[in-house]
């Protein structure tokens, strides 16, 4: 059996860290949504008991360091799977960008393996299992728009956000998420209004969504990396209704209602930033799985 499955990137419309927990993680409130910048995974069931990864991108491991490999290994051990799998990944999501590319790939792998290994797991069971690998993966299993709490693994679905344009810009730097969280001072930052964001999404209020964006991690990443702030400022100067860093960075995204204005923001970033994308929110039904027996 062979299948292919799409793994969309995500952005954080709001990201709040409330306090540091006893287990070392931060208690978070994040509103996230998937976008139509996506990787594609191709899975082939093997009779031989092995996991083979083929990543069509540089600098991405094809062994146990890869979340996809970890996802496959976890399912094999948990359900005593004797079959193997070959997974080919066609990468489009930037690496180490704050867009959950690795987490989305792992989520897609879990869903694909559930099919080709005929495990019969529900989406809820897959999401619960995914939390053993990484905090962002549960959201990526569900996709769409959702509130994530706990350390990010507790997911409450929200309506999809209204149609708009999203311009992404990633500078040629990398950011360490553990370092950013370690340096975050939760008592000394402005916190986003998560409830207002949720209400705006439920009401389909795009202006309210724009006004409610916020990310406490900007207080650390922008201070350490001034080029991230310059990208955000440039987006706003070219007409973005809102601009925010996604995750711990370094990618910044702009939210824009009109195509013409979005194109102006996009053109204003090209040449200024190494990687620039113009995308839309992910639509229901786009996260397709194709099966070939």
Swiss-Prot record:
Encoding gene, per UniProt annotation: ispE
This protein's UniProt keywords: ATP-binding, Isoprene biosynthesis, Kinase, Nucleotide-binding, Transferase
Active site location: 10, 136
Function: Catalyzes the phosphorylation of the position 2 hydroxy group of 4-diphosphocytidyl-2C-methyl-D-erythritol.
Family matches, as NCBIfam families: ispE (TIGR00154), PRK14608.1 (NF011202)
Source organism per UniProt: Listeria monocytogenes serotype 4b (strain CLIP80459)
GO MF entry, a single one: ATP binding
Enzymatic reactions: 4-CDP-2-C-methyl-D-erythritol + ATP = 4-CDP-2-C-methyl-D-erythritol 2-phosphate + ADP + H(+)
Family recorded in the similarity comment: Belongs to the GHMP kinase family. IspE subfamily.
Name recorded for this polypeptide: 4-diphosphocytidyl-2-C-methyl-D-erythritol kinase
EC number per UniProt: 2.7.1.148
